[in-house]
């Protein structure tokens, strides 16, 4: 009888299939050796039908034996089959379901290492290159390496770039490849491929200590959705080796440049070094790398930079020649590569190895999605697919291009370890200011640095004190995986969060689309509002990361677009979903804090909705007051000067709509620079008018009682000083107040640019969240250069595997291409790979975008016109609306300062308590 589709077998039964040095096998060899039937004839004979139950009880009886020679042939074939099983990978992907073992069934074909025996490298044997499977004695320094198909042969010259990546089909049909039959598991292909010999030589001591892990790269062609990966029996190599994953780090890539990716990958390796150096920890130690899985998810294999793939291939986690576009007629949705490497890349794009560089092994998983579906969908593959297989304790997300601190990953994990009620965390994100702060000379970077520091020192501590982190995107954040999982009968946060994946529902609302682009903020909300749970969030400033801020207005617009849109849409979503807080089990005080935070969050977003009108009204009422004789610093030019600046401001506001709707930022740099310069000049004029109308009347008066009261000074200067005092106070507590002196001027001058240019551009591109992904209902030819495979009647597929010289040639080509790459660019145009939705969908989303922008602009226009008509420009001190705007900002800032101070004080007290506790423990330790 022939083998059917592979069944599942548990690890404890596998040893039964692996022959040892038993008397049966030795007698069989002796018997065959005296026979006229040689081994090659026996091995090349017909497929085994069954075997003798006497010698091998796991086989069925022979149906028919015609001659002694046939017996010898079948016995020889049986012996060869069992020997190959002995060299198979002992932790097969089939080991996920336990069942009873039937000794009368034929042996289960395990997952073979492609083209190489999977026995651990033996120092006393090596492969005879002149025999298919023979052995010969060798020195103790030699290792069992390749089968004859890929045995050591002269290494060819490195292939050209086009040969390595675009001529795979031609290579597969050449004599440099051989065929291999491997089993299919639920329609998905999983194979263990040998790694190049040159790569093994770069792994250093790790190769000798973990030869089996360093000699093979596991490739899986995933044909199912990420939610079905676990049910289909797929297993990660970390699970097969029985490792307990504490942290899974996710790094998503799309069209980012090589330099950004190298910075993040290098910083992750440095964090692994720190974890391995914590020899006194109860969890971490010398083998800490076994508890960390680094996942790189690429959003579309046609959009990623080629030199990024060269880097991944140089590390060893990527091989371009093994990908399969279709498996058994089903389209491959993602290509997954698993490898453990000690090769790292530094920030200067230099490869470092374990020898002499102090690198530690890093377990890497590369998931290359076949289509570009966005970062949101990449997180779905990580959380619903990869994390469900790895089962980590903590899932961390690192923004591409972020340079993590050397202990960031440890402190992120420690926050979850100390407090069991923390469901999510976010770290501290800083702007790279260069050596001695030289980059702060650029006003755009200085303005972003000021805003980011206020975010770190004021907003994040306040949010952490309340329990929900609602602010802008972070460079490092994470979740406790248990808090994300389903708990029957209630679905977990992931079920609701990824239910709105655009791959599943392409016609959802435009605000909902942008809300889900908020990523961690929305998932944070799902965690704290989980039914019958009481998770809260925490800010961990020790988990720090540094990013490079855009140094031009065009770059700022590109980076701020999704942040502004997702922030507003998230506010709408939180307001609508507010009553989900009532289904949680938070304590009353925590529930009260979350309720107050949600209300303040909603009011703040409402004020920001009218920020265009509010700034124009403040400019109009303050500057118009200086054009009259009582407060006139310009003489006869006061009124004309005010009108000139007023008309320039109005024209600039309308011009921003034209620039946003008709151009990309990088194509109109000059116009953006001119508008930014004009906005800054207007801001200088506005600030001068504020100080003049506030201080001149105070200077001319002899009555000191009017310093604070119903006057210009109290409304304008004093309120602004209170806000600045709050900023300085929390920054001083955080031991970082210097940015106020170096960046506040640039921040004030660019304020109208942030209010008008950034907001208008972002909202005019509100529809980008809905049309920049591939359409799941359209078919595109992605299979260029990638082969297919189909399953035969026995549950196997035949694939083409390159020999050793081809592996080395491709690897050396990747090294050469990576070494010669000069990619330091930040911008990369991938419009050729952005497959748009049908025109009807684009029209639908653009229509919604137009309506929303129209409502937003008209609302601000009506508010400005009405208030200008209602209030007299000469009587600003009686303008109740402007007082409300200024003092509401003061109230928001003061409230957040109280929360931030509470958070910082709590952390200080906690540190002191832990220090005292540790001292007492040492003192009382006998």
Swiss-Prot record:
UniProt GO BP: cell wall organization; chitin biosynthetic process; mitotic division septum assembly
Chain segments carrying region Disordered: 1-56
A Pfam family: Chitin_synth_1N
Compartments where located: Membrane
GO cellular component: cell division site; cell periphery; cell septum; division septum; membrane
Cell division as UniProt keyword: yes
Coiled coil region boundaries: none
GO molecular function: chitin synthase activity
Ranges of compositional bias, category Low complexity: 44-55
Parts of the chain that traverse the membrane: 564-584, 599-619, 641-661, 671-691, 721-741, 853-873, 885-905
Family: Belongs to the chitin synthase family.
Function: Plays a role in septum formation. Has no chitin synthase activity.
Protein name listed in UniProt: Chitin synthase-like protein 2
